[in-house]
Swiss-Prot record:
Name of the featured protein: Oxysterol-binding protein 1
Biological process annotations from GO: culmination involved in sorocarp development
Disordered as annotated region, ranges: 1-43
Family indicated by similarity: Belongs to the OSBP family.
Coiled-coil residue windows: 1-31, 340-371
A Pfam family that the UniProt record links to this protein: Oxysterol_BP
Any GO MF annotation of the entry: sterol binding
Cell compartment(s), UniProt: Cytoplasm
Gene3D superfamilies xrefs: 1.10.287.2720, 2.40.160.120, 3.30.70.3490
Entry GO terms, CC: cell periphery; cytosol; membrane; perinuclear region of cytoplasm
Organism, as annotated: Dictyostelium discoideum
Subunit structure: Interacts with dstC.
PANTHER family tied to this protein: OXYSTEROL-BINDING PROTEIN 1-RELATED (PTHR10972:SF78), OXYSTEROL-BINDING PROTEIN-RELATED (PTHR10972)
Length: 389
């Protein structure tokens, strides 16, 4: 990342076991809601007032472990981007890496290529001091994805589609796919945002799937948690990741490591490749840069992967084909205010959307249960109903 740690004095080495214990005790505790006066005061803060100082005042009211998904935020702390778009962006930016796996007949080599793709789905947070918008129930996000194949040719029949299928708990179902190739990656998990004292922990609670129709194979993967280091101005993945196939006994276990306060590297990880209980390979490096693989039988180390720099071209629907539930429509008022640097306007437009959603939720209590429009649950998995050719 090339950044230097900032404000390290506020984030000292702590007893992680004690933090996790407190987090478990407060996991279901609602986040305190700031009053309108509190929010306005933060937006009206004197020019030059440290954003971190304002955050420090705000989090004094929050207990460790509190779910902060729905915490009130002043306009100056709103990132004008729907969370719904993150999953699609992350999994489509380098979708070409997954299409490469569809041309690999060797089972182990195909799994290694899938793991390369999964490394590309890891991304750093744009702004650790701003919170993206929580998607409303039924909100959607879609686009056409243009990638390069192994020969440098354009492949344009790739798409992503996302829908917010649940509000309590917040669940987004996102699919990136190429129907012609029979390649599909679906990410559909409850996401928990917890305040952990000096950072925010984003957990993806469950498994996601990648399918290759050509090989009649389904991969299951578990994404590592993310730690947003508020006072050090960066984010990182810390924890475990797993990749396995339903066709064989190959398994990849990854451990993502935290950047120490002093020294160390950003975005470090180590993965081990197994066949059954036998360890075959070790992959090590930084997921944002270079990675090497070591054959544990011969102890030979060779380059494994370097993260690509050129991402996919994203083509959004034109105005005539944009759904009324699209994020660009739902949050248009917030986005417009953001372009004008009108932080109070952002707050006001956000409140308008949220108040309308509360009214709709009240009406739904007396009606049938809300059902997703674009995804159906088939064999226990949420799947996109209509795939584009």
């Amino acid at each position: 990342m090339g950044k230097k740690d900032k404000n390290v004095s506020v984030e000292e080495e702590v007893d992680e076991a004690e933090i996790e214990k407190l987090a478990a005790e407060n996991a279901n505790k609602p986040a305190p809601q700031l009053t309108k006066e509190d929010l306005d005061a933060m937006d009206d803060a004197e020019p030059g007032t440290s954003r971190l100082a304002l955050i420090g005042k705000m989090i004094k009211k929050v207990s460790i472990g509190t779910d902060i998904s729905n915490i009130s935020m002043p306009g100056s702390f709103i990132l004008a981007k729907s969370t719904l778009s993150y999953f699609s962006d992350n999994f489509s930016s380098f979708f070409g890496e997954l299409l490469k796996a569809n041309k690999i007949d060797n089972e182990l080599e195909r799994m290694l290529q899938v793991q390369r793709y999964l490394f590309t789905t890891l991304k750093e947070t744009e702004d650790t001091t701003r919170k993206p918008l929580n998607p409303i129930l039924g909100e959607t996000w879609q686009a056409n994805i243009h990638v390069k194949d192994g020969d440098g040719n354009d492949v344009t029949d790739n798409y992503f589609f996302a829908e917010q299928i649940s509000h309590h708990p917040p669940i987004s179902s996102s699919t990136v796919y190429n129907k012609k190739e029979g390649v599909n990656c679906t990410f559909c998990l409850p996401v928990r945002s917890q305040f952990m004292g000096t950072y925010v922990k984003i957990s993806f609670e469950g498994e996601s799937h990648i399918t290759f129709e050509k090989y009649d194979e389904k991969f299951t993967f578990v994404a590592p948690p993310m730690a947003i280091r508020i006072f050090r101005s960066f984010s990182e993945y810390v924890g475990k990741g797993i990749l396995k196939s339903d066709k064989n006994d190959y398994l990849i276990k990854s451990t993502y490591t935290s950047k120490p306060l002093f020294g160390g590297v950003y975005n470090g990880f180590e993965s081990k490749v197994y066949k059954g209980k036998e360890k075959l390979y070790k992959i090590k490096g930084t997921w944002s840069g270079d990675m090497k693989i070591t054959n544990l039988k011969t102890n030979e180390t060779t380059p494994f992967f370097t993260r690509p720099t050129e991402s996919a071209k994203v083509v959004f629907p034109d105005d005539g084909n944009t759904l009324p539930t699209d994020s660009s429509v739902v949050w248009k008022g917030v986005f417009d205010a953001s372009k004008k640097d009108d932080v109070k306007g952002m707050s006001q437009e956000k409140v308008k959307v949220e108040e309308e959603q509360r009214k709709l939720a009240h009406h739904r209590k007396n009606a049938d249960e809300w059902k997703p429009v674009h995804f159906n649950k088939i064999d226990g998995r949420w799947q996109l109903v209509n795939l584009k050719d």
